[in-house]
Amino acid sequence: HQVATGEIVNCDVDIAGINDLYLQTVRSFYEMGGEKVFDADKIVMFFDHYAPCATITQAENHKQFRKFCFEQGIEKLMDIDQGVCHQVLADKGWVHPGEIVVVTDSHTTTHGAFGAFGTGVGATDLATIMITGKLWFMVPEIFRINLVGKLQPGVLAKDIILHIIGDLGADYGVYKAVEFAGPVVNGLSISERMCMCNMSTEMGCKTSYIQPDAVTME
């Protein structure tokens, strides 16, 4: 259904991801009365920050995560040899246009490259999703950046987004959604689009979006 800027909506979450910095998510799950996750197939655990572990505490955290996954029947445990969370989600083909992707990582905006709503949250919000399958959001203001012209040799997607952030500032997009569009964006590969969307959080954006096209579907 249609929504308006500033409206509060309670949404079903398609992918809930937790990285190994956030063992508190598991603790919060039980502190909030959680017994069984809403849908084990929609929850993904990533060991990508402490990989490999540098301390006993980090190793113990991984042990607790593995135990939780076993008890809850969560099969999507991306252990220390699987890769970085957002790249794994892309490589596995788990993100699709129109889906809501929530991960305990600020760069979850990456998944706007696939036409999905991707945003980062903290431990309590993610625990809420694990219990209910839902999370509330305030519909953000949207601004669009149209990129036209032709890139000079050696200019990459990272250069584009860093230039945009430099022009607009680190707080320009706070609780806003950015749409990247125009001929330049249309000519970018999916990896380049992921780079653009990933870095949008560095100007404060709640989420990012690129209209799905043939590149997305491929």
Name each region found by the language model.
Residues 1-218:
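Fe-S-dependent hydro-lyases/dehydratases of central metabolism
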